[in-house]
Amino acid sequence: MGVAKKPDLSDPVSRAKLAKGMGHNYYGEPAWPNDLLYIPPVVIPGTIACTVGLAVLEPSMIGEPANPFATPLEILPEWYFSPVFQILRTVPNKLLGVLLMAAVPAGLLVVPFPENVNKFQNPFRRPVATTVFSAGTAVAPWLGIGAALPIDKSLTLGLF
């Protein structure tokens, strides 16, 4: 299920284009049968062939074999949990760390509401969403890289 954007009928230019049949359905060719019938039979086997080819040509192990009798000195989470791990590691109060972790998705859920009144799709005309996206794109790698460093260098990434 997708979100369909309705044309802006209050704009006289859009109304004139729609009256001539030149509105939102003006460009391109139909998806059926041109795209949906001919592209997947080529793309799906090609993707499978590339995956199998890489597996056959490079069958090296991903890491060293697991040893259930030896515990590593420092247990690190998977890479996609690194920013969250860094939040928990640097905040001294664990309850505050858990609340900060819960604030991330809660903040992302709030972002669309102030932007809902804005009819523009251009990111430069949607300052709240663009700022939140830019800040998240900058902070997430910073926290992720910092999680792999020792705790005394983790916030500054060893630069200062």
Curated annotation (Swiss-Prot):
InterPro entries named in the record: Cyt_b/b6_C, Cyt_b/b6_C_sf, Cyt_b6/f_cplx_suIV, Cytochrome_b_C_euk/bac
Location of this chain's protein in the cell: Plastid, Chloroplast thylakoid membrane
Predominant subcellular localization, coarse grouping: plastid
A single Gene Ontology CC term: mitochondrion
Membrane topology qualifier: Multi-pass membrane protein
This protein's UniProt keywords: Chloroplast, Electron transport, Membrane, Photosynthesis, Plastid, Thylakoid, Transmembrane, Transmembrane helix, Transport
Chloroplast as UniProt keyword: yes
GO biological process, one term: mitochondrial electron transport, ubiquinol to cytochrome c
Transmembrane segments: 36-56, 95-115, 131-151
Family, similarity comment: Belongs to the cytochrome b family. PetD subfamily.
Subunit structure of this chain's protein: The 4 large subunits of the cytochrome b6-f complex are cytochrome b6, subunit IV (17 kDa polypeptide, petD), cytochrome f and the Rieske protein, while the 4 small subunits are petG, petL, petM and petN. The complex functions as a dimer.
Protein name: Cytochrome b6-f complex subunit 4
The organism's taxonomic lineage, starting at the top: Eukaryota, Viridiplantae, Streptophyta, Embryophyta, Tracheophyta
Gene: petD
